């Protein structure tokens, strides 16, 4: 229900402005943290094929060319010409103490953990994108509020100066108005600096400069209590799923280490040819071949304590991961409770600050009216204007905090991944596709073409140094050419 509501909300766009959905589509396609994690999963997929290769037949060929330098005794008539030899050997592992079986299971389980980690990274990156989007909206609103405040204060100072000239007000009133105007300009400069920082973060996370941003869609209904949020998070959080699968894989590693104390058995088949290229006086043929077949067993008797050390090491590593499971569970519980509390507090702050803004608007209107008839002082009007500005800023901030905390709660509950958000700006990344391609590969010469860099760069041509320290091998067409204040289009996900 939560996922369906969130998908429907994100699909509702606003004409003429970038939407949160478009920002998330761009993030999904081009964020380097996310695209890098996909490559990490591809590397993990390959470990399954590596583990399986240890249990497959191995064929090798040998070729040799030798010349006899000295002969004595019975070999005097053997000839000194070059001798060529060639052979083909086939070795088939029959029993390896369960090492291959457990290695494959460990690799497969780590692939499952890698997929869960990819989901966790998706949720974390989307949460960063939502935070960056909401920060820009908040800071733009705060800058606008401060700009309006500076205009009002400048008008107040002008009016106060005029009234001072005719003797209606004192120099103190003018000084107070001047001081409050300079304070307003200081607050405006601070707000503009925060906006620039937020826009830079937006560009870093989402991949292009922010344009006009539409208000975000409403969040879906969230859990009614902290306990419900924790319960959902413990069942679906991808970080917890990933570490749990890693703990299972560590158990298979212990079995692999134990296999080092067991015998191994292999079947061998060989064909060998030897030929003498020179003349010989011996009454024997100068060439021949041989075919061999048999079993090769290796029975470890003493290995200097190596198997026991490996077992202890793998058991300790398993214990470490099991402890991490508990630590991750604690973090998930804390994250769910913290996000729920932050969301609840922000919602209450929205209600309180909405009332405060309305009350401060009435108070300011009353102060101005009373000051015009001499029952209020200039400083009281200035204070009323500052209190209104403060309450407006707090309201804008609370709205941002509520939305980000709500999305963070969705992320902790495992409901902020690409499939949950319905991002159809292109085909979603299929983690099973690469696994099917590589996990059962038998071909020694099979390889994939080099993967081009998918993530977009955010360096504009004007910012590029003459001798850059890092020159990644990427398609220059994927460099976002827009300057920081210009919006670039949303890049579609890679095909």
Regions found by a protein language model. Give the residues of each.
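Small/polar-residue-enriched beta-strand and adjacent coil segments characteristic
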Residues: 19, 58-121, 239-328, 335, ...
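Acidic, low-complexity, intrinsically disordered peripheral segments
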Residues: 69, 396-495
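Short, charged, amphipathic alpha-helical segments
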Residues: 105-108, 171-180, 312, 378-386
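Periplasmic alpha-helical coiled-coil/stalk elements that build and connect Gram-negative outer-membrane
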Residues: 124-235, 342, 346, 366-369, ...
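A contiguous binding-surface segment within folded domains or other stable secondary-structure elements
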Residues: 271, 277-279, 329-390
